[in-house]
Regions:
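Bacterial Sec-dependent N-terminal signal peptides
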Residues: 1-26
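N-terminal periplasmic/intermembrane-space "pro-region" immediately following the signal or transit peptide
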Residues: 22-94
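Transmembrane beta-barrel strand/turn architecture of Gram-negative outer membrane proteins
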Residues: 59-76, 135-138, 145-148, 263-265, ...
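Outer membrane beta-barrel
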Residues: 73-102, 113-227, 246, 250-253, ...
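Outer-membrane beta-barrel translocator domains and adjoining extracellular loop/strand segments
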Residues: 96-101, 156-162, 184-191, 229-237, ...
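Loop-centered beta-sheet repeat module
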Residues: 239-289
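Beta-propeller domains
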Residues: 281-285, 294-299, 305-313
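Conserved small/polar residues in nucleotide/adenosyl-binding loops
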Residues: 323-330
């Protein structure tokens, strides 16, 4: 009986040993940084997953980093991350500039507006973000990303969608940042709104980015238009007939330095209540932006925008409908 028990124990030990040896073949990839990912994979596919998950080339400063914990398949070719990023800010205004949680110079009230309080204290937590990110790499699609995110900036501090898109083979399909933008040229700010005067908007789009040439990136996009303006009883803005078309070219000389040129062409449709007819007018926008490092700790950001009919795409101006053009054959403006 004792001999049989010993034999069974030896056989179990022999059976467990290969399993332990197999487990030792797994590679643990760990980063010491605060926003790192701990990932376990049987092969080098895990390296690719982490690279795709950490890519922030099409995100702004306030977008959350990759989640620390992921769900993966057995082969390490796909990963799903779900995370909640809680963000709170507090501010004190010593001169009563803007009665808003974000700083928009266009909202600075004129004297005699009825609010004579010069000091103001505010707190905000509505920019806390809940996001879901699914990444992977396949033979036919290459690197792909499916990303959805939202915060609580909706009416009454309700949940509001911020991003929902899929990326593969250079294409972006869904709701994301517009192509007439340069996210990398926007400096980091405590204020969620970001720098005024910069091109900043989100839209539903079909875009393509080509980075096959060394140091160069070229992009084209077809986007859902957003037309807004100041109207009167003779003019109204409703249905739009054509999408916006955007294009860009970017040259990079290192990972933190580039210069980018962009353009957008849009057809803006409005209805005349005088003529009982819809009219369209073509408008455009041009952009030049850059960011480069002077030293390791000194980064320069810059952006120049010029155009007609692009007020709804510019940060700050988009809050007050400052898109003006003369309506057809009338004295009205929109």
């Amino acid at each position: 009986m004792k001999t049989s028990f010993k034999m069974v124990a030896m056989l179990l030990g022999i059976g467990i040993f290969p399993l332990c040896a197999y487990a030792q073949q797994k590679v643990v990839i760990e980063d010491e940084e605060p926003n790192s990912i701990m990932f376990v994979s049987k092969n080098k596919a895990g390296d690719e997953i982490i690279r795709i998950m950490n890519d922030r080339s099409q995100m702004r400063f306030h977008d959350p980093n990759a989640p620390r914990f992921l769900l993966t398949d057995q082969k390490g070719k796909f990963a799903l991350g779900l995370s909640l990023n809680v963000r709170a800010t507090a501010e004190y205004d010593f001169n009563g500039i803007v009665n808003d949680v974000d700083f928009y110079p266009a909202l600075i009230p004129q004297r005699g507006s009825g609010n004579f309080a010069k000091n103001q204290f505010q707190m905000d937590i509505t920019t806390s973000t809940l996001f879901l990110k699914w990444v992977g790499r396949t033979k036919h699609l290459g690197d792909f990303v499916v990303y959805t995110a939202g915060n609580f900036r909706g009416d009454g501090k309700t949940f509001e969608l911020q991003n929902a898109y899929a990326q593969f083979l250079g294409f972006t399909i869904g709701y994301s940042y517009g192509s007439f933008m340069d996210l990398s040229a926007l400096p980091a700010t405590i204020d969620f709104a970001g720098p005024n005067g910069s091109a900043f908007y989100r839209t539903t789009q079909l875009s393509y980015m080509c980075d096959k040439l060394k140091n160069w990136r070229f992009g084209v996009a077809m986007e859902m238009p957003s037309v807004d303006g100041t109207t009167n009883s003779d003019v109204s803005i409703n249905t739009q007939r054509m999408p916006d078309f955007a294009a860009s070219a970017q040259y990079n000389w290192n990972s933190n330095s580039h210069i980018k040129l962009g353009a957008i062409v849009r057809s803006m449709t409005y209805s005349s209540n005088v003529h009982d007819k819809a009219f369209s007018t073509t408008r455009f926008g041009l952009q030049a932006s850059t960011t480069f490092n002077v030293t390791k700790k000194w980064q320069v950001f810059g952006q120049f925008n010029y155009g007609k009919g692009i007020g709804s795409y510019l940060n700050d101006l988009s809050t007050v409908s400052y898109t003006h053009l003369r309506a057809h054959e009338t004295d009205s403006y929109l």
